[in-house]
């Protein structure tokens, strides 16, 4: 009764893509996919086919383009390939409910970063513009230090590690900020910060985060053989006082683990990398909504110390309960391979998604 009581809401793909007993499974209950784009013709073609299937299956996609070689007299660079994704998103819908959606990620050190930053500005060569996509820039600690010190910043081709150009870091930063002012994007993704937060067992396996997903609420490793998967749902913080000290959080973690298992069992070979990643890491994304409603209901100023204390209290409670249930699931069903030796079933547990539809 948690959903009917307004204590939590399913993510849209969980709610809309659950098949009826007699219905064939077409779309899947997964909100987020994170893909890696290799620097090869085979990899680019595979990525194009995979993201079409992922979109049809019902999920939004984040694509990580930082390793694709820069434009040269022998290579077109990543932008024309990203443009094909732009066209795909108008054709391949997310399951039954909404059009395809995609966010491209690129490192701040890539030689094509300026063109990438400007790809949503509707002037210039239309064949290299991408008005139907979202985009994000991976910002490193070294770049921010270069901005702080007003140093030059090297743009390095990922193919041969040669320096293609050197530009004032502050000039690039100004372009980022101006583009955000004009278009609302790119997202700012602090790539070193998220890699430091990766579970140690995953670091020990040589795994690395190359970017995030469509909505930037979760960071998971991607590689040639891994397309990361995360299934979402969110609790309603407005009714926190009603559901705290109930078994709801633990029940929801168990529920999402079951949803992930449904995906693993029904994902076809056309999205085998996503199925493999889900089996290895079993990432969940239990989120939250209604924080402003809780504060308004209790007449707590948004920026007050009381609000900060309550925020810490609530999310500490959610995290603690989630970890307890993941440990319990590991005892019952086994650890996932990426968390072997930790006593946990899931490598990730919490993710605060946008909740546009869920909030309604």
Task: List each language-model region with its residue ranges.
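Extended catalytic cores of very large enzyme megasubunits
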Residues: 1-360
């Amino acid at each position: 009764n948690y959903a009917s009581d307004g204590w939590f809401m399913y993510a849209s793909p969980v709610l809309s893509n659950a098949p009826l007993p007699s219905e064939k499974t077409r779309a899947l209950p997964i909100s987020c996919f994170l893909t890696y784009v290799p620097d090869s013709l085979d990899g680019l073609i595979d990525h194009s086919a995979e993201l079409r299937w992922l979109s049809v299956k019902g999920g939004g996609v984040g694509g990580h383009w930082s390793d694709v070689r820069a434009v040269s007299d022998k290579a077109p660079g990543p932008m024309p390939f990203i443009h094909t994704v732009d066209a795909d998103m108008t054709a391949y819908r997310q399951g039954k409910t909404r059009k395809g959606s995609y966010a491209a990620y690129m490192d701040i050190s890539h030689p094509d970063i300026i063109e990438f930053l400007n790809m949503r500005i509707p002037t210039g060569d239309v064949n290299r513009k991408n008005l139907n996509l979202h985009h994000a820039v991976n910002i490193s600690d070294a770049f921010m230090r270069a901005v702080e010190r007003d140093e030059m910043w090297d743009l390095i081709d990922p193919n041969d590690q040669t320096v293609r150009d050197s530009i004032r870091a502050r000039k690039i930063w100004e372009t980022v900020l101006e583009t955000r002012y004009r278009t609302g994007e790119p997202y700012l993704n602090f790539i070193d910060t998220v890699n430091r937060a990766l579970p140690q067992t995953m670091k020990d396996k040589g795994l690395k985060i190359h970017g995030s997903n469509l909505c930037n609420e979760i960071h998971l490793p991607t590689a040639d053989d891994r397309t990361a998967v995360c299934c979402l749902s969110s609790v309603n913080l407005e009714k926190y006082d009603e559901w705290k000290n109930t078994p709801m959080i633990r029940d929801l973690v168990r529920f999402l683990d079951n949803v992930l298992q449904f995906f693993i069992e029904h994902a076809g070979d056309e999205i085998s990398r996503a199925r493999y990643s889900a089996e290895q890491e079993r990432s969940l994304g239990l989120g939250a909504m209604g924080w402003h409603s809780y504060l308004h209901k209790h007449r707590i100023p948004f920026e007050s110390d009381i609000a900060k204390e309550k925020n810490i209290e609530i999310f500490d409670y959610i995290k603690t309960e989630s970890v307890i249930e993941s440990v319990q699931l590991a005892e019952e069903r086994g650890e996932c391979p990426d968390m072997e030796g930790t006593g946990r079933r899931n490598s990730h547990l919490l993710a605060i998604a946008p909740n546009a539809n869920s909030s309604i």
